[in-house]
């Protein structure tokens, strides 16, 4: 099938995946642009966003642009970052205390932007995501308004021509 949904979400670690993923098969260069209007508070560092995947198998090469609440106790602190798994069954970027500050994220090699305004107190403002594939380069951008974009980062990941985006 060229589009569908992978369902699940119990536990994921650096080498396995387990999450909800609605996807479409794309060929070659592609991009996805979407707005995240709100998110449910679940746990520290829970990811929500968009991604390119080489396959639907756990451990697939991945470029994922999204955001995570840094601490569940502080509902206004969100970080937008570009995570990646460079090799099949390799480790994905460690999304934990590494995204609590731009300095920690930089040490961990995780591109991060922390000054977008996704949420103000109890009000959701939303955040736009744009993830682009050009050859083996994946570049992520984020925006408060969908017009002015801030580059989050880029990763080079060798992937097949046909990959999944969602």
Question: How would you describe each model-predicted region?
Answer:
Residues 1-166:
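Extracellular glycan-recognition regions
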